[in-house]
Amino acid sequence: MSEEFLFELEESTLKKMLKRKEEMGYAKKSWNEWFDSFLNDNKTESTKEKLERIFEKITLEKYYDEWIQNFSLNLDNIQNDHSARELIPQTNDDLPSSALVIGRGPSIKKHNHLEILSKSNYKGTILCSDGSLANVLKAGITPDKFKNFFVMTIDTQERQKKLYEDPIIKKYGNKIKCILSSTASPHTYNKIKEAGMEVYWIHTLVDYNKGKNSFNYISGVMTKTEKHPKGLPAIQTGGNVGTSAWIFGWTVLKHSHVGLIGIDHGYYSN
């Protein structure tokens, strides 16, 4: 039985894979046949399991040291700021009806979603990906109109700080709550605070399946303090901030309905 699944690739990586697939004589054959040609290792793993293992290995090798370094530098701020656990509704009366996650995929322009939303009477939560925030605010979708307004960053790279440098973000920053991964760059954190935002920390799950030897377990224990006796909430990310925001919407904020715009997870043929 075939299995369908999704994973995130940069466009440059996809192009390299297409070229390599053609060079190996698999241009007109399925992706499954190509993957099986070099993943066949006499184990009982499915193709899906093999790919997940390979991409996990690549991710850990590329980012593990950076996660540890960023976490250690963030620890003082984590202990002094908010845990995203504080955002969990305490009573049924606190439960909002819906949330809308906003990404920056090309479909958001194709379907004119920002203009439609800015003119709407939507009363639910706004959950912006960091990359979409400036354009969302410029489109008139601001915390002045949409009161329950969040932005999220999970990526570890220092370049994410540029997403918070637009002057319009500082204009509205003190009305926006930022959901930030404990492994985010401290430089990104500084830009977020300069914009006037309150930070609510989370853990992003990467290796929790490894038990007490995992980075997730160790960092989870280290963030349990008198102020945060239960530590930080931890979420699966799906490998990107849009999926992370969607998961955060129903696991932490407890929304029963979470909509998506600008979350494409792919490329148009043109």
Each model region followed by its residue ranges:
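Short, acidic/turn-prone active-site loops that include or flank metal/cofactor-
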Residues: 130-133, 151-160, 182-184, 203-208
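Active-site/ligand-binding-proximal alpha/beta "capping" segment
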Residues: 186-257
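Glycine-rich phosphate/pyrophosphate-binding loops
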Residues: 133, 139-143, 147-155, 252-270
